[in-house]
């Protein structure tokens, strides 16, 4: 059952939303955070485990150096300060997903702190301040059996899979985001999108929200206009898409607005986002005073990255998405809308590689964001996995440019390339798809169509040359789209002049 909601504009008239985002990034390391177990969580349950990630007595952890390097690179990309000295801590809690009854995380000494990220939303640039980015391990996975929708409520029993326990995470926490007004959910979505693109550019994570590589907990409260007193916040979990981040925040803003308009209090609690119905439901009540009894991890030495190493990692950072977008937008003369659609489709690198292979930017964009994007969506794969390379797209466009193919024939060539029939030229040869420009073959078809359409032919003789389009269409149909339309038009006008 959904809650009563206050219209969004009414909420904005009286309240200022304050947003905070906690984002967990699953790192693409081969092994777990503190042991040598594989991070492949798709294996049979409880097969990628060992005494360390199960927390068995006497086991000793050792920190994953690759995870530390990834954390520093993330911090640098987010304009953070990198701690000269930090350490891990034990976050104590009791729940079946962590057998040792504590999570190894960081508390008051994160590896990265005080950063920022500029994001664009609705044609404006907003700065999101980042409080910290710290390292921690993931928990195991619960499977509740016998309940509804996999929830613990009504379940007869629960199963635990610890393959995920100990997988390296980076948690990125923003400072309270204020002053955005009605655009708060939109800016949060843009922040998540840019964060995802940065992780992919760095190569530290697959950053697939639908697969749990990138997980967001969205906090929001309402502050009365003209007041500096923060309202009671809720934390919405289970937000697994960019659209859901925006939708969950907007829903919570309207839900809280209704409660406050009725003189009721907002309860500080976790909420769960329901994707199907696009609403939140109550989880558990929370308190700012929750005591996890943090204390320094005694089994791990402190981390002290040298300044030389940090500066080396800074120098080796790849071009980040915002800089690449600005550079390519200028080079290609794309509109803001065109660049945004390319970024949102994850096509920027593909477009750049296609242009580097000799294709014009506009043509590269046309193929990747229309025909190939549609085929990728139908197949349920990423655009890069659709079955056609940037070089092949450039080859395809060259065949169009030199008159060998029409756009319609080129679409058939795409089908052939994806089906594994070879490069574009091989598909053209194998399927016999080249445009027919031979006057003898075209002339015969033109004569037949003129003879079959005397009234249209008479109009053309009378000076209505635009009527030639009807004859061209029939000829293209007869020749299965392979006729050179320009030459067909010339022949029609020559014969009827």
From Swiss-Prot:
Q: List the disulfide bonds.
A: none
Q: What is this protein called?
A: Aspartyl/glutamyl-tRNA(Asn/Gln) amidotransferase subunit B
> Any idea which GO molecular function terms this record carries?
asparaginyl-tRNA synthase (glutamine-hydrolyzing) activity; ATP binding; glutaminyl-tRNA synthase (glutamine-hydrolyzing) activity
Q: Which SUPFAM superfamilies match?
A: GatB/YqeY motif, Glutamine synthetase/guanido kinase
Q: Which family does it belong to?
A: Belongs to the GatB/GatE family. GatB subfamily.
- One biological process term in Gene Ontology: translation
Catalyses which reaction? L-glutamyl-tRNA(Gln) + L-glutamine + ATP + H2O = L-glutaminyl-tRNA(Gln) + L-glutamate + ADP + phosphate + H(+); L-aspartyl-tRNA(Asn) + L-glutamine + ATP + H2O = L-asparaginyl-tRNA(Asn) + L-glutamate + ADP + phosphate + 2 H(+)
Q: Which HAMAP family match?
A: GatB (MF_00121)
- What is the role of the protein in this entry? Allows the formation of correctly charged Asn-tRNA(Asn) or Gln-tRNA(Gln) through the transamidation of misacylated Asp-tRNA(Asn) or Glu-tRNA(Gln) in organisms which lack either or both of asparaginyl-tRNA or glutaminyl-tRNA synthetases. The reaction takes place in the presence of glutamine and ATP through an activated phospho-Asp-tRNA(Asn) or phospho-Glu-tRNA(Gln).
Q: How does it assemble?
A: Heterotrimer of A, B and C subunits.
The EC designation for this entry is 6.3.5.-
The record's keywords, sorted A to Z, are: ATP-binding, Ligase, Nucleotide-binding, Protein biosynthesis
Top-level taxon of origin:
Bacteria
A Pfam family reported for this protein in Swiss-Prot or TrEMBL:
GatB_Yqey
């Amino acid at each position: 059952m959904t809650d009563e909601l206050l219209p969004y504009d009414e909420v904005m008239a009286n309240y200022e939303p304050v947003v905070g985002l906690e984002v967990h990034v699953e790192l693409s390391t081969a092994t777990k955070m503190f042991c040598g177990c594989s991070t492949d969580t798709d294996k049979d349950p409880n097969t990628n485990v060992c005494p360390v990630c199960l927390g068995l007595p006497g086991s000793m952890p050792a920190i994953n150096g690759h995870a530390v390097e990834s954390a520093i690179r993330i911090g640098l990309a987010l304009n953070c300060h990198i701690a000269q000295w930090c350490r891990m801590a034990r976050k104590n809690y009791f729940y079946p997903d962590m057998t040792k009854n504590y999570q190894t995380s960081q508390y008051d000494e994160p590896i990265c702190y005080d950063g920022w990220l500029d994001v664009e939303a609705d044609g404006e640039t907003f700065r999101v301040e980042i409080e910290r980015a710290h390292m921690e391990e993931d928990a195991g996975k619960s499977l509740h059996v016998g309940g509804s929708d996999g929830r613990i409520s009504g379940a007869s029993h629960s199963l635990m899979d610890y393959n995920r326990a100990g997988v390296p995470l980076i948690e990125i926490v923003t400072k309270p985001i204020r002053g955005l007004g009605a655009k708060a959910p939109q800016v949060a979505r843009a922040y998540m999108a840019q964060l995802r693109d940065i992780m992919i550019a760095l190569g530290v994570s697959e950053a697939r929200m639908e697969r749990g590589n990138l997980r967001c907990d969205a906090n929001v409260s309402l502050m009365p206009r003209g007041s500096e007193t923060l309202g009671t916040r809720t934390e919405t979990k289970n937000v697994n898409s960019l659209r859901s981040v925006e939708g969950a925040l907007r829903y919570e803003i309207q839900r809280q607005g209704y409660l406050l308009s009725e003189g009721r209090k907002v309860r500080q609690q976790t909420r769960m986002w329901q994707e199907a119905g696009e609403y939140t439901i109550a989880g558990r009540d929370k308190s700012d005073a929750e005591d996890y009894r943090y204390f320094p991890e005694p089994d791990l030495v402190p981390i002290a990255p040298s300044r030389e190493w940090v500066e080396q990692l800074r120098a080796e950072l790849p071009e980040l998405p915002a800089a690449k977008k600005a550079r390519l937008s200028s080079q290609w003369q794309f509109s803001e809308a065109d660049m945004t659609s390319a970024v949102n489709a994850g096509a920027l690198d593909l477009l750049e590689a296609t242009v580097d292979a000799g294709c014009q930017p506009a043509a590269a964009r046309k193929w990747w964001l229309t025909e190939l994007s549609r085929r990728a969506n139908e197949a349920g794969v990423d655009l890069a996995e659709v079955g056609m390379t940037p070089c092949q797209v450039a080859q395809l466009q060259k065949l169009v440019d030199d008159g060998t193919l029409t756009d319609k024939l080129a679409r058939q060539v795409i089908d052939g390339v994806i089906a594994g029939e070879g490069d574009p030229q091989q598909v053209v040869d194998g399927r016999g798809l080249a445009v027919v420009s031979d006057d003898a073959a075209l002339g015969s078809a033109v004569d037949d169509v003129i003879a079959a359409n005397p009234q249209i032919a008479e109009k053309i003789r009378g000076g209505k040359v635009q009527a030639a389009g009807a004859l061209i269409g029939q000829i293209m149909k007869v020749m299965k789209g392979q006729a050179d339309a320009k030459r067909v038009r010339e022949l029609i006008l020559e014969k009827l002049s």
